[in-house]
Amino acid sequence: MSTTRTLLPVIDVNGVSKVFNAASPNPVQALHDVSLSIHRGEIVGLLGTNGAGKTTLIDLILGLTTPTSGTIQVLGESPHTAIKSGRIGAVMQSGGLLPNITVKETLELLGAAFPSHRAFDDIIERANLGDILSRRVSKCSGGEQQRLRFGLALLGDPEVLLLDEPTTGMDAGARHHFWETMREEADAGRTIVLTTHYLEEAETFAQRIIMLN
């Protein structure tokens, strides 16, 4: 791999603004002229007050919405292309789960979407899912569902992990296990971007903090 390619940012956000309901009498400016670069192996925390645009920025990097102006590249590609190739994994605050199947069935169903994936035993251990495998998703607590989302994010062995309030609903023990696992993932060279309202978590885990306001 060339030195130039190694130094290219994994995530490159250039002059991005996002306005919701732009054509209405009351448009909402979620982000204004945001630029940032995140490099391979970095652990970066996105902090800001409610409404600062943290989740909107994560959604943009994931290609779930498009910027009103500016550009975003992930691993040198459009967010949509990077997601489609399985190079990005994400843990979101809510949604994305089928309530009427078990945790194990969820892993198997999503695993089938990848040409190849990490071993289920590895995912189960790293996401601490062993005690809830046979439980229906609808019967899982909020913290248990977050653990499942984390496992699903790791399935495709992604190069980038985006974590939007990943420990929401987790008890102290589950949060500790989660961050220990995240450190191991970062040590393996994965790039990690997280939002959290737990300032102590961000200061402890992130190598760099970016404030949005």
List PLM regions with ranges.
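Walker A (P-loop) phosphate-binding loop of ABC-type ATPase nucleotide-binding domains
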Residues: 49-53
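Helix-to-loop junction immediately C-terminal to a conserved catalytic motif
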Residues: 62
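Conserved ABC transporter NBD signature motif
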Residues: 70-80, 84
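Conserved ABC ATPase "signature" region
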Residues: 108, 112, 117-133
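Conserved catalytic motifs of ABC-family nucleotide-binding domains
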Residues: 157
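Catalytic Walker B motif of ABC-type/P-loop ATPase nucleotide-binding domains
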Residues: 161-165
